[in-house]
UniProtKB/Swiss-Prot annotation:
Low complexity: compositionally biased ranges: 142-169
Listed PANTHER family: MITOCHONDRIAL 28S RIBOSOMAL PROTEIN S6, SMALL RIBOSOMAL SUBUNIT PROTEIN BS6M
MF terms (GO), sorted A to Z: small ribosomal subunit rRNA binding; structural constituent of ribosome
Residue ranges with Basic and acidic residues bias: 115-141
Stated name of the protein: Small ribosomal subunit protein bS6
Amino acid composition bias (Acidic residues), ranges on this chain: 170-185
Function: Binds together with bS18 to 16S ribosomal RNA.
Keyword Ion transport: no
Keyword rRNA-binding: yes
UniProt source species: Desulfatibacillum aliphaticivorans
Phylogenetic lineage: Bacteria, Pseudomonadati, Thermodesulfobacteriota, Desulfobacteria, Desulfobacterales
A Pfam family the protein falls into: Ribosomal_S6
């Protein structure tokens, strides 16, 4: 058994269900010939370097699989006939592979990917909790600052009458002075 990679570009205007049918057809073909799909990666719609069958964009898909050489001829024949596929390329990546070793390698890669996703999720959760804590602290500081400003705003209002009283006192003093002039005369 050999290991292959096939990349094909399908029509980007295909409806999602039609595209899914095409992908299932390719995966089923590999399974029919006792092959094993290591991974099936959809890259999505991308701009093509040049027009292919009057299309400027294509939907890219990468398949990594193990199979016998007879499958490749049949798969390429089907890809040439199918109008939904714009272009394809198949390369052999390994001459002889142990299917159990490939399955183990794929399982290990999946476990590492899941662990990385779990670690990323935990890190995101920790960052979210820290952001919430910082927001709560900021809100508490703002409330505390507002509480300090409120009594300070009330205090000048109480001091204002005291400031008016000295202003009245000098006004009374000149009134007394003329009285003292009359008494002297």
């Amino acid at each position: 058994m050999r290991r292959y990679e096939t990349i094909f570009i399908s029509d980007p205007d295909l409806p999602e269900d039609n595209r899914a049918t095409l992908f299932e057809k390719m995966q089923g073909l590999i399974a029919e010939h006792d092959g094993y799909i290591a991974f099936f990666d959809e890259w999505g719609a991308r701009k093509l370097a040049y027009e292919v069958k009057k299309k400027k964009r294509g939907y890219y898909v990468l398949m990594d699989f193990c199979a016998e050489g007879s499958l490749i001829a049949e798969m390429e024949r089907i890809m040439r006939i199918d109008d939904r596929i714009l272009k394809f390329l198949t390369i052999q990546t390994e001459e002889e592979v142990d299917l159990d070793a490939v399955k183990e390698q794929v399982a290990k890669a999946k476990a590492e990917k899941e662990a990385a996703q779990k670690a990323a999720a935990e890190k995101a959760e920790a960052a979210r909790l820290e952001a919430e804590k910082a927001a709560e602290e900021e809100a508490a500081k703002a409330a505390e600052a507002q509480a300090k400003e409120a009594p300070a705003a009330e205090a000048p209002a109480e001091e204002a009458p005291a400031a008016e009283a000295p202003a009245e006192a000098p006004a009374e003093e000149p009134a007394e002075e003329p009285k003292s002039d009359e008494e002297d005369a």
